[in-house]
Amino acid sequence: LEKDIEQVLINYGIYINKGWVNLRDLKNLTEEQENNRKNIEKAIEKLEKGGFEKDKAVMEYIKEVSYTYLNRLAALRVMEVRGLIDEILVPRGEHGNRSFIGSRFYEVAREFCKYEMDGGLGYLLNIMFEEISEEIKMLFNTEDEYSFVTPSSASLLKVIELLCTNIDEETWRQDEIIGWIYQYFNSIEKSEIFTRQNQKDFFISVDEVPATTQIFTPDWVVNWIIDNSLNKVYSEMKNGLRGKKNVEDIKLIDPCCGSGHFLVRAYDVFYEMYVEEGKYTKGEIPYKILENNIHGIDIDLRAVQLTGLILFIKTKTYLKENGYDTNTQGKLSVNLVCADAILLNGRRLEDLKEKHKDNKTILKMIEIIYEEFEDVRLKGSLIQ
């Protein structure tokens, strides 16, 4: 995916380690592509303002676009295996080696499909992304800065083939599958970082902290911690050893939630607690858990998005299993925060100081805030 996205950017005149082609010199772009080029430039400039050098900003953008599409496809595979959506990825012989949705689309749009290299799959995927984004914007928002570039048909088909053939359906049913993919994706960057550790001037930059410090906690550790914290609190409440509370008043927060392994396990525990309490129906409980009980923070935006995604899938799974409507549009309330920020720097910071140059109090406040948040991507939720 990354090599493919890099080539797509080259088609837009954007290079790594080479000057960019001026937009007015790109005569072959359509009006839509010209707008895409402008939006891609803005996204890369935003990364530069966050501290990346220009070439590294381009590389980071490529990585984020690739990661976005990989996770979208993985999420679709999880949902189709769980029966939450009709199959759109996996091809079946009975559907003419197309997916169920693909075959239905082909029946009504044969001419369109014939002229598309992927048989219309890319078009279908965008429709599905837009539909899911109506329920959860995280990761599926087709108007975000990482959606202006679309992988080639060949690349998409290759990734889909790998997801459908190299990972069995039972594995896709596991709650941890999204976290495993997240860990694998970051393990490559982590390995690259530690190959430099014997260098004399080796150091880990703030931008490398998320990938370097992430550890996927084994199930038995997660279960042990949840059993000796959340489960213990509830048990003590039931046995009169602790003041009794309604389940919706019990809060659990993971200040470095990663891809949500602890929160997913806590979700199951809270669900059983609500069922035992008996105040709400099984159609209400999933929403109550997200609204009242589960909270997560991380310095990695992608980790936060993936946590939101798996909690979204978890909610739809519980609703489906108990015979309730799985359309969550307008009903989800997810308490997740990315403890990250892009500080003003360069000219923008100087303009702010100039604006308040006659107010020493405000200037001092700007100085203090800037110092506190200078390493926000490192400190995360430790900042008070």
PLM feature segments, named:
Residues 1-233, 312-336, 341:
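Non-catalytic, mostly N-terminal accessory regions of nucleic-acid modification and defense proteins
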Residues 193, 197-384:
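SAM-dependent methyltransferase catalytic region
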